[in-house]
């Protein structure tokens, strides 16, 4: 029994170390750009610290560290908000990643190319588990599988580039990237 407990503790420490290394590698990468797909949604994301821009077929979002602009194809509107830290966790990949340690238990396994981190919620949640595929060579997220009672959803990351060159204006609303006539609704 003691050996089983020691193995579980070591596995959790290894998973936490891999997750921490992945997060620190991301933070040190400067401006990061990547493509992604999740179900029928495909797009690109550019991140610089807490700032981000997402351009997808059904959604566009910008966050400059203070103000968030979100365009929804379904409503044809751009909503302008000053999100709280809790709201940022829902849309900002870095904020979401930083909240994982507190909200999930972690375990790790290895394949030839990836560390697989299995995250299970510490409290009751709609999410049963999240499996993160972290590249062994670069500690970069390659894929995430979200499992709920209703099934699973896979997020795939492609064309991951670090130290990308994007101006500060990348993280502010760009009217030219939404259809002409889209209503801007200021909810601040």
Model-inferred region functions:
Residues 13, 34-39, 48-56, 92-101, ...:
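Short, solvent-exposed secondary-structure boundary motifs
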Residues 29-35, 48-54, 112-118, 138-143:
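Short, hydrophobic/aromatic-rich segments at coil-to-beta transitions
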Residues 44, 59-60, 105-107, 129-133:
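Short, surface-exposed charged micro-motifs
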């Amino acid at each position: 029994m003691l050996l089983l407990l020691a193995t579980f503790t070591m596995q959790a420490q290894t998973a936490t170390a891999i997750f921490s290394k992945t997060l620190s590698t991301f933070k040190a990468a400067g401006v990061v750009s990547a493509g992604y797909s999740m179900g029928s949604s495909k797009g690109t994301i550019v991140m610089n610290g807490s700032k981000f821009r997402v351009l997808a077929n059904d959604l566009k979002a910008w966050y400059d560290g203070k103000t968030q602009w979100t365009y929804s194809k379904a409503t044809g509107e751009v909503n302008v908000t000053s999100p709280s830290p809790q709201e940022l966790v829902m849309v900002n990949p870095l904020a979401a990643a930083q909240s994982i340690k507190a909200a999930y238990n972690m375990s790790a396994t290895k394949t030839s190319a990836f560390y697989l981190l299995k995250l299970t919620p510490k409290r009751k949640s709609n999410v049963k588990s999240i499996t993160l595929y972290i590249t062994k060579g670069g500690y970069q997220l390659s894929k995430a599988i979200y499992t709920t009672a209703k099934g699973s959803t896979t997020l795939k990351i492609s064309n991951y580039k670090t130290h990308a060159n994007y101006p500060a204006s990348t993280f502010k609303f760009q009217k030219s990237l939404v259809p002409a006539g889209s209503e801007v609704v200021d909810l601040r």
